[in-house]
């Protein structure tokens, strides 16, 4: 098994994950972010976001998440397009399993996995 060490490992790439990454990176903690199944989170499938400060005319969800990612990278966040499949908090440093076998050791883990839509299967839901 390949082993690496991180100060802060962030699971999830929605608004909470990227905000955590920006703050951790600005603090000099060199965060490592794993995007998960849906890079950018639910906002990547959202059209108009009109209730977020800084966008007086609104913004498309995918554009907003691209900008969050760019800002996190600008401050030094390392971003991986991979899934964290398990976390072991019983040892320190903590261990996160990436995919099937790759283990990353880390001093801190931020879980920002967000939410996912629960579809009911009714006709009006697609409108």
Language model regions located:
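Glycine-rich NAD(P) Rossmann-fold beta1-alpha1 loop
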Residues: 14
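Aromatic pocket-lining residues of Rossmann-like dinucleotide-binding sites
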Residues: 24
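N-terminal Rossmann-fold NAD(P) dinucleotide-binding loop
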Residues: 17
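FAD-binding core/adjacent interface of flavoenzyme oxidoreductases
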Residues: 1-11, 27, 32, 79-127
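Active-site catalytic microenvironments in core metabolic enzymes, especially phosphate/sugar-handling
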Residues: 40
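Conserved acidic E/D residue at the C-terminus of a beta-strand in Rossmann-like folds
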Residues: 33-37
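N-terminal Rossmann-like dinucleotide/flavin-binding domain of flavoprotein oxidoreductases
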Residues: 44-103
């Amino acid at each position: 098994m390949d082993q690496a060490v991180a100060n802060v490992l962030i699971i999830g790439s929605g608004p909470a994950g990227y905000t955590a990454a920006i703050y951790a990176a600005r603090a000099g903690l060199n965060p490592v972010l794993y995007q998960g199944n849906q890079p950018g989170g639910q906002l990547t499938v959202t059209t108009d976001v009109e209730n977020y400060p800084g966008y007086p005319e609104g913004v498309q969800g995918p554009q907003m998440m691209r900008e969050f990612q760019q800002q996190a990278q600008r401050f030094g966040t390392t971003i991986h397009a991979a899934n964290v499949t398990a976390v072991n908090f019983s040892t320190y440093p903590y261990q996160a399993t990436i995919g099937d076998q790759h283990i990353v050791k880390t001093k801190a883990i931020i879980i920002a996995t967000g939410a996912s839509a629960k579809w009911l299967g009714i006709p009006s839901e697609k409108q």
